[in-house]
């Protein structure tokens, strides 16, 4: 039907007869000659329709609407020197049409313009409602082609490393850990339910028990959770698992995988190995386990310096088991007013969103003099001031912002303020140097965190992470006592403050798995009911194994420079988990519900 893609033609094709298919991007009449920009996935080419080629051909071209689907036959020729368009890859040539067939006309009104020549922004709601049209836009086509290149590169890399692709079930059982499941009622097994998988976690471990040794899958996963710009109810993971490899080997292999993707997509050679921080280091220095290391303003714990200070907000927080931390804003005296730090100010509001009651501040003046509220200035002695300025590195003109209280709240508040100021003050580099892509492994996570509401431990990642051998010891009788303080052999890959993926070495000892489930409050009978198939498998010669999963939607978002993963997915959902194009989710008939033995109790408030 066609000989070439529109965007494939170059000067080497001059004097060739070609047959092209595509959409009318725009059509214009210049002095009795009609120029059609014909667009397909590969790009755009200028078609020239001269009346000398026939009146019927010219009349057909005159009546064309944008987005009409055409087939063009013609001769490739050079453009006149004054008509060369350096912005187009095909800008040195054009096609003189000698045949034109309308394959499908546009009969309705277009809700927005698709043309590459129209930079008019379109509301996202309208784009999502007419996604089939939105996908024709150059930006969206480019994003999806880049997504394809990313996944193709990953597949080739893993296959070259001896991995095989295996599909795991989409209809599985609900488990108590993790986010809320999407549930699917079974018609055949009345009263019972499937769950859509949040990840292939258990199945990929069972594949290792089954002796497949190296597995990967481009997996569809589902989580019924509140959404934000980089979350979707259904998403794509590059899921990887391997046997007989230690943590160091797994990290190095996946560094090479990421480097291969960045080389193929961006043409960038990433420096290897990636830096590493322990979880405790990340929390101490950045207040988060997903630190953005492209800029400074790291957190400083100044509790030891200020613990005996007369300012009760500081000394009281420390005495209660909390901490006082600060960040130093370079030249902050000139950039940030007191109004912004006090209640109602934008910086105060950022801290408050993280649960902090407020922020304290010190302004550093010449000769190490300081300005602050009286309660701080009057209660900070010269020794404390000297130690504070030395530890923070603050100099004249700098602003020190303090958080005081529970350490977790202080970390969260100062992390939020740090990110806010990093963006606002232009501290984040945007040029194409190594600082643009700051990869980082965060390792040595705690096995568990406290659920204060329920007064019980929860797995920080999931309950299948293997604990650190040094923390656990070799005596199974001591495991229950040591587990709550143990570190997990877990690792997350972070890029510019965003988590790209994470994983761990897995528990391959059945007794240890039972004890971990007990530690998170799962009774043995319930553990057997929920995870008996896994524990049985671990008793049948399970090999040491581990793996990880990368969020492909987020990776593609970063590679394309988009702000939302919705612009890297062909048919995404909104932040209300709706598809505006198909109007899913939607109601179903009573007959369908009756077949499933399901009754809806929903009452429409209208």
Curated annotation (Swiss-Prot):
The record marks 30 as: Important for tRNA non-discrimination. GO terms for cellular component: cytoplasm. It catalyses: tRNA(Asx) + L-aspartate + ATP = L-aspartyl-tRNA(Asx) + AMP + diphosphate. ATP binds at residues 223-225, 232, 499, 551-554. One of its GO terms (molecular function) is aspartate-tRNA ligase activity. Residues 201-204 are annotated as: Aspartate. It is found in: Cytoplasm. Its EC number is 6.1.1.23. Pfam families: GAD (PF02938), tRNA-synt_2 (PF00152), tRNA_anti-codon (PF01336). Belongs to the class-II aminoacyl-tRNA synthetase family. Type 1 subfamily. Homodimer. This is Aspartate--tRNA(Asp/Asn) ligase. It comes from Prochlorococcus marinus (strain MIT 9313).
